Amino acid sequence: MNAVGIDVSKGKSMVCVMRPFGEVVLEPFEVLHTAQNLHDLAEKLKALDGETRVVLEATGNYHKPVAFVLHDAGLFVSVVNPVLIHDYDNNSLRRVKTDKKDAVKIANYTLDKWTRLRQYLPEDDTRLALKNCYRQYQQAVAIRTMLKNNLISSLDLTFPDANKLFSSPVKNNGCEKWVDFIGDFWHSECVSSLSANAFAKKYLKWCQKHGYVFTRSKSDEIYACAVNSASLPKSPTSKLLIQQQVAQLKAVSQSVAAFRQEMLRLSQQLPEFDTVMEMYGVGPSLGPQLMAEIGDVRRFSSKKSLIAFAGIEPQPNDSGKVVGNDKGISKVGSAVLRRTLFLIMTVILQTQPQDCLLYTSDAA
């Protein structure tokens, strides 16, 4: 009965092997994350007498190569939520945290939870690619929001409220009409220096070039906004700044669109795709996000397990004669999954479907 605790970090891990009653089989030692070192570690653990179980914390992407190599070598591997390790056996007033201490702590956890450890199973390539793609999508969306806010701030000096002139939906390639417009008409004087008719003709050609619908009323609205704009004088520097910001925003927006399309393509290969997409409030954007965060739903033993994974189960708050009425959610699980669920519920609440069972039960 060999309990292997592995404290994983970037590029290396600390390994400790223990047996019941505090017997130390192998003192904590360091292993680099190279193919040869991980292979040697697997062989060393397989050579131990008795059954061997390996436990390591889920640490982003760092633990995945280690878990895969050890599992592929035929060892029992369990990947545990770091919260469980953090809350385990904190019976000392000293708060010592080193890689060696953590490895020993994980090994003791392995011994204590021996019969309840869940075996690690590598994700299939499609689910892994979907989750990685979603992570990059999140990063790109955050950068796009930052660049968009920066551009709007710069427009306050050259063409105030130009971003509010258009309400066209985003194209499939990520392009937005107001961003394309600002790329060519970066200053209010680019419009106001012309007559209304001259601008209308120029705007018509611009719409035809970029594939947008032209209306004379919209042309007159843009012209009136430009004439009444209070902006700084035109300068080559202002033009450079605006056009470079537009180019950056377009590039990131195209990346966001590409990630979204790839996520949809990958999610269509999963068996639960049709079921998820039939859910009200879930579309081609939120559906793949939901599937990416939940992963293989078959790994959950019950719906309560899935609720706990999302961190939305109620948190009891009772003590003695005091009964807590405000039992908020635990928020221990995936924050990204909770955000996705929040967006889905926002869609449901905004559209208010009359035949939704949620509203039928509430009304009853």
Region locations from a protein language model:
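A detector of single, family-specific signature residues
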Residues: 1-361
